Amino acid sequence: MTEQEKIRREKLEELKKLGVNPYPAELFPINNFSIDLIEDYKENSKVTIAGRIMSRRIQGNASFAEIQDSKGRIQVYFNRDEICKDNDKSKYNIIYKKLLDIGDIIGINGRMFKTKVGEITVLVKDFKILNKSLRPLPLPKVDSDGNEYDSFSDLEQRYRHRYLDLILNSQVKDIFVKRTKIINTIRNFLNKKSYLEVETPILQPIPGGASARPFITHHNALDIPLYLRISDELFLKKLIVGGLEAVYEFSRDFRNEGMDKNHNPEFTILELYVAYKDYFWMMDLTESLIEKVCIELNGKTKIQYDSKLIDFKAPYEKISMFDAIKKFTGYDISRMDENELRKICNDMSIEVDESMGEGKLIDAIFGSKCEKKFINPTFIIDYPKSMSPLTKQHRSNPNLTERFELFINGMEIANAYSELNDPIDQLERFENQLELGKKGDDEAMFIDMDFIKSLEYGMPPTSGIGIGLDRLIMLMTNQTSIQEVLFFPQMKPLRNEPVISNDAKIVLNKLQKKGECDFNIFKSEFDFSNKKWDKLTKELRVKDLISISKNENNLLIKPS
């Protein structure tokens, strides 16, 4: 515990002794928000606000402070004689001046006015402590020239402590407000078409609907393995079989795979399935939807993303998978078998392994040489059958499927099919996936016999799509990392700091700065008795924080 934290806890106890509850249970009747008061300023109007103290300037019997609420910040003015009308001035002199800190949350009743320099301000008539903060905020520092430094900007700290990020970096909150607006725009777009929003299981007996490595867990009561869903596709198609002709879900999916700026193991996807439609119809719908999202969020179809100008105005370019590969590599792979594909991968220095079948080899070529080329929205259409085990065979080419993926800024944003509804063909495709699994492909699909059974009862012609919402939100908010658009991105847990005494901390901190050194010389730098020193070194050795060894001449000590 730091000195500041100790002081704040002492203030907490002082408040309690004065009969002030630092964590009151009753509601505080907020009637106003900071930005609204500034934008719709009314002289001398009564206001009730609440928020966190972000700065204070105490000048004897008066003080200016800044309060931050959910919408922004506003200046407030504390005057002792306004707050304390009778002879007892303790609420200002003791509670406000001495026992409150930056970071505390308070409620305020007051009136609006403008200072001599014209700044809109709340004159505090009364205040109430709503929460006593026990840790100081890591606020940026300002040097003598007014330059700000040491801001809360370290990426790892921001992601690990998103609550602080939201308090200290106002632009972060704006990203997540926009995230909700994007999701609501999509939901309204689909609801106006009378499509039905549904929920399907997250824990599944078979991880179906995509080629991906699943997370596995165990259900104790049923004594069976269960998987976190990698996709909700098969369940939504079962609903189409059941007669629900248009269904969608904002799905939380989980894939036990790598992490980078475009991937998080837990992510959000929109899945939509509409009966009696095909992939051409779905392309039109997708264009309309994404164009609308862009306009609703930005007021126009063109946005600046990183250093690029991206235009979301429909219609979007369309190019087949094979044509795209030929355009950017010079190879026509449309008639190549697995061995030929493996050879040209080697020729182009594309990393492959023996577990990869034809579909994954083609995907590797496209991913390595093509996808980064598509900046403006582009539909990649007509995928090989080996890459699309859930997709209907192309109506004019039996080696292809009616599938498209939407690429924007070199990222896959959406994946869509004319859905395979032939149960015999579907079972054969699943069996081919099973063979890939035997070869070592840990992303190969499982066979879902209940899904096959549902198809045998009959699923109407259907088109389906999955849109990666996190990536779409990245684009629309000009963020280059998926972690920026997730409240709590996945992070490796920090090793818990061992609990040690304050004296042991002093010894350890000094040793960590020195590194390995002579035990007796290091010991002489502290004013501890031999008994105390033995106790401290034992404490640190038991926690595996230091090691003591002997060479030919000396006893050595070093941090672990």
Give names to the regions the model predicted.
Residues 498-501, 550-560:
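Short, cationic-aromatic polyanion-contact patches
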Residues 28, 203, 536, 553-554:
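Residue-level "edge-of-site" marker
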Residues 1-499:
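Class II aminoacyl-tRNA synthetase catalytic cores and aaRS-like
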Residues 528-542:
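Short amphipathic alpha-helical interaction segments
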Residues 497-526, 535:
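Short amphipathic alpha-helical interface segments
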Residues 541-551:
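A short, conserved structural fragment
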